[in-house]
């Protein structure tokens, strides 16, 4: 639909001139026709699949580009932001000067000038009191489709007099030739100005930069108001009991929160305020590598008309080879949240969480499939944000790569990690919430813990049977492990049982414990961090 109150003249205020036409808040049918326009070339062009969803390629960037992320350092951000060049912890918040910002802004506005543009007005945040009104400006139809899927779609009434709090200008086709002189990482850039409230994108076509860009902004604004901002999925049971699932990419956030027995609040980004837990988004962004109808039926059936596939292999007959990771292992699909049947309606929010689940995919095979955390262990493991990946090599040698990502989302944090931990703990204490560490990764057999066992573990957490189970303590990590759980193979609950000998586990566990201790060093420069050391592994 075209709304008369947004004209090319209005865009001059942003520095975008001589716009040929504005396609404002296009319908899904309009986007479908635009994406499949045979006149399109390169990465603008979509391909129709037999599932009804359009598939696109995002070019050389098949994931985010954290090394190309910058934030303007000015009076707004100087003393509040977690900068990459201050303190012990590493992060991606590289400072940008006002001068370089103006240059980058000029590149993007020049790129968008004289074009036919898609403008999508959305909300970020399901709670009307704290949501951001976000305007996306792009020349690429599928990028407009992506944000229409991923953000909250305003009603026609809400669009009347829509005033954006934040503007995202996507100039994917332009790059910065002066990057070397400006001391930047490359010709590509994802830059934020929290005073002007603008995000600029140049050189990368990856849709996730728009999604995670707004997450970084919410991560700045909300905790300063005492509201938890979380990289997690969330769902609610029949009795109104809310659970949140923290975890890095590939640990099972989307899969485990999409549960036929519970209604989905959202799969990736949430806030927690005085009313309860609310989704930031209006869609889901699921990994599709090795997707099968049998293992993940809800996600598979969500891939239909209006869903948008990224970087998958589409065969000549229009069928999708979900097993093919030749372009990237990070193949994805975005779809509006209502493509999942069992969701919270009409607004993606619910009450206070009583179960907080930290998901880790431990490729070292050391951590138990589930353990119950004390209050201090909750903060320790939240700040550690551990997972580990298996990296394949030509000869099949697979050495695990550890990842410690503060708050299970360090790439998106704009404040110091301890600020998120403090707000989360306050919210948990007020709600009487309990935290658990769930390992969805590997054990001593070299096999990944089955989705079936993990789902049974999650059920035991959610129905309270884990809280009533007898527990024993795992050495080194001092984790409380249940002796048995309904529907779970008792043998695997103690990770030592999956090794040929307890000594083998001990050796690997000692190596992993050292990594935890080394990583946590960066928090010991504050009294609060120092106090948490005892909640971690002890050698």
UniProtKB/Swiss-Prot annotation:
Keywords: ATP-binding, Cytoplasm, Decarboxylase, Gluconeogenesis, Lyase, Manganese, Metal-binding, Nucleotide-binding. This is Phosphoenolpyruvate carboxykinase (ATP). SUPFAM superfamilies: PEP carboxykinase N-terminal domain (SSF68923), PEP carboxykinase-like (SSF53795). Mn(2+) binds at residues 212, 231, 268. GO terms for molecular function: ATP binding; metal ion binding; phosphoenolpyruvate carboxykinase (ATP) activity. It comes from the Bacteria. Signal peptide: none annotated. Pfam families: PEPCK_ATP. The gene is pckA. NCBIfam families: pckA, PRK09344.1-1, PRK09344.1-2, PRK09344.1-3. Binds 1 Mn(2+) ion per subunit. It comes from Salmonella choleraesuis (strain SC-B67). GO terms for biological process: gluconeogenesis. Substrate binds at residues 64, 206, 212, 332. The keyword Nucleotide-binding applies. Its EC number is 4.1.1.49. Pathway: Carbohydrate biosynthesis; gluconeogenesis. Belongs to the phosphoenolpyruvate carboxykinase (ATP) family.
């Amino acid at each position: 639909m075209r709304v008369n109150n947004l004209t090319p003249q209005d865009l001059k205020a942003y520095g975008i001139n001589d716009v040929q036409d504005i396609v404002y808040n296009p319908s899904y049918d309009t986007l479908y026709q635009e994406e499949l326009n045979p006149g399109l070339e390169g990465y603008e062009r979509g391909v129709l699949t037999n599932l009804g969803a359009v598939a696109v390629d995002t070019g050389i960037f098949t994931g985010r580009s954290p090394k190309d992320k910058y934030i303007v350092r000015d009076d707004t951000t100087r003393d509040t932001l977690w900068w990459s060049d201050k303190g012990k912890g590493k992060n991606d918040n590289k400072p940008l000067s006002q001068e370089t910002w103006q240059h980058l802004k000029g590149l993007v506005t020049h790129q968008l000038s004289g074009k036919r543009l898609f403008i999508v007005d959305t909300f970020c945040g399901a709670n009307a009191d704290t949501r951001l009104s976000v305007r996306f400006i792009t020349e690429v139809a599928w990028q407009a489709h992506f944000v229409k899927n991923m953000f909250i779609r305003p009603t026609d009434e809400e669009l009347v007099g829509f005033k954006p709090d934040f503007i995202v200008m996507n100039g994917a086709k332009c790059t910065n030739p002066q990057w070397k002189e400006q001391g930047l990482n490359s010709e590509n850039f994802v830059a934020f100005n929290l005073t002007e409230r603008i995000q600029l994108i140049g050189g990368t076509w990856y849709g996730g930069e728009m999604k995670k860009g707004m997450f970084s902004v919410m991560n700045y604004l909300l905790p300063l108001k005492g509201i938890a901002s979380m990289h997690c999925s969330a769902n609610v049971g029949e009795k109104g009991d809310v659970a949140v699932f923290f975890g890095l990419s590939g640990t099972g956030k989307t899969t485990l929160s999409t549960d036929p027995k519970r209604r989905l609040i959202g799969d990736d980004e949430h806030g927690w305020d005085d009313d309860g837990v609310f989704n930031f988004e209006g869609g889901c962004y699921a990994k599709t590598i090795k997707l099968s109808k049998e293992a993940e039926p809800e996600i598979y059936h969500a891939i239909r008309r209006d869903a948008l596939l990224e970087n998958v292999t589409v065969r000549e007959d229009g069928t999708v080879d979900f097993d093919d990771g030749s372009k990237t292992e990070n193949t994805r699909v975005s779809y509006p949240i209502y493509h999942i049947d069992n969701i919270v309606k009409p607004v993606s929010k619910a009450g206070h969480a009583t179960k907080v689940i930290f998901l880790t995919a431990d490729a070292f095979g050391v951590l138990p499939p589930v353990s119950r955390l004390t209050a201090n262990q909750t903060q320790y493991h939240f700040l550690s944000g551990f997972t580990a990946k298996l990296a394949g090599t030509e000869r099949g040698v697979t050495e695990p790569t550890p990842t410690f990502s503060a708050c299970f989302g360090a790439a998106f944090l704009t404040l110091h990690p301890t600020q998120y931990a403090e707000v989360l703990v306050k919210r948990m204490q007020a709600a009487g919430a309990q935290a658990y560490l769930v390992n969805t990764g590997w054990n001593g057999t070299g096999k990944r813990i089955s989705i079936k066992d993990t789902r049974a573990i999650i059920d035991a957490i959610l129905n309270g049977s884990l809280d009533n189970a007898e527990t024993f303590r795992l050495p080194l990590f001092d984790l409380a492990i249940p002796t048995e759980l309904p529907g779970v193979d008792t043998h695997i609950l103690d990770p030592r049982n999956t090794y040929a000998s307890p000594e083998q586990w001990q050796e690997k566990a000692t190596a992993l414990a050292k990594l935890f201790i080394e990583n946590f060093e960066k928090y010991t420069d504050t009294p609060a961090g120092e106090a948490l050391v005892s909640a971690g592994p002890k050698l």
